[in-house]
Structure formats: C-alpha cells, structure tokens
Amino acid sequence: MHAIMLKAKLHRAEVTHAVLDYEGSCAIDGDWLDLSGIREYEQIQIYNVDNGERFTTYAIRAENGSKMISVNGAAAHKAKVGDRVIICAYAHYGEAELASHKPRMLYMAPGNQLSHTSEAIPIQVA
C-alpha cells in the first residue's frame, strides 16, 4: 500500500510579494526550505486563509533570512501582499515508511517570524 501524506507545511506565512510579471512559482525564504525539507522546484499547494483560494505551483529559493513569501506569475492573482497562506508539500510513502512518517511543520507568527516547529498536529477537541 502507498499513501500520499503531508511532507511539510508552512502554517500562516504572510505573503510579502505578489509579482504577476515573473516566471510562475512561489519564492520561499531559503532557511525555511531547508528547515521544512521542501526542495526547490518541488510542487506545493498554497491555501490562502484570507480569501479561500487554493492553488498549485512550485517552490523556488528566496534569499536566506529574507522572510520572503513571493507568489509569482499567474498565481499572483490568487494572493496579495499581507495575505496569510498555508504552504504544503505532499509525498508518496510506502507501507514501511508510513509507521514512522512525521511531517515537518513550521508555524509562523506575525511578520513571518518563526514561532515554532512540530511533527504532529494536536488532536482537535470539541
């Protein structure tokens, strides 16, 4: 059995740039790519918390320490500067990998400050 699982997530990052006339992609602070395990040119899903848009693009590296999230190309129609987004990467895992799989999640505070990291989402209670 194989399953598609969450590999990495940047939770509630703020869009810092939306550049329509740029080759399509999403530039992400290189430190965050390294910490999350998201690779350059890897497919990512972006969920816009502020307007409900959901779209697919690929990650490119922004300058380390820049705190940049730049939504580029046609995707710039889906997010504006200041929007809060969730950026996710998914991967296929075999049955042997599933038992030990833990996603890498980065949680952002206002101003794209890294709040904390986690490998699990708390159980939701009523």
Swiss-Prot record:
Signal peptide: none
Entries under InterPro entries matching the protein: Asp_de-COase-like_dom_sf, Asp_decarbox
SUPFAM superfamilies found in the cross-reference section: ADC-like
PANTHER family from the UniProt entry: ASPARTATE 1-DECARBOXYLASE (PTHR21012:SF0)
Associated pathway: Cofactor biosynthesis; (R)-pantothenate biosynthesis; beta-alanine from L-aspartate: step 1/1
Free-text comment on the cofactor: Binds 1 pyruvoyl group covalently per subunit.
UniProt protein name: Aspartate 1-decarboxylase
This protein's encoding gene: panD
PTM comment, free text: Is synthesized initially as an inactive proenzyme, which is activated by self-cleavage at a specific serine bond to produce a beta-subunit with a hydroxyl group at its C-terminus and an alpha-subunit with a pyruvoyl group at its N-terminus.
Cofactor(s), names only, from the UniProt record: pyruvate
Pfam families, A to Z: Asp_decarbox
Record carries keyword Mitochondrion: no
Binding site for substrate: 57, 73-75
EC number: 4.1.1.11
Functional summary from the UniProt entry: Catalyzes the pyruvoyl-dependent decarboxylation of aspartate to produce beta-alanine.
Subunit structure: Heterooctamer of four alpha and four beta subunits.
MF annotations from Gene Ontology: aspartate 1-decarboxylase activity
GO terms classed as biological process: alanine biosynthetic process; pantothenate biosynthetic process
Record localization: Cytoplasm
Entry superkingdom: Bacteria
Coiled coil: none
Catalytic site: 25 (schiff-base intermediate with substrate), 58 (proton donor)
Family as reported in the entry's similarity comment: Belongs to the PanD family.
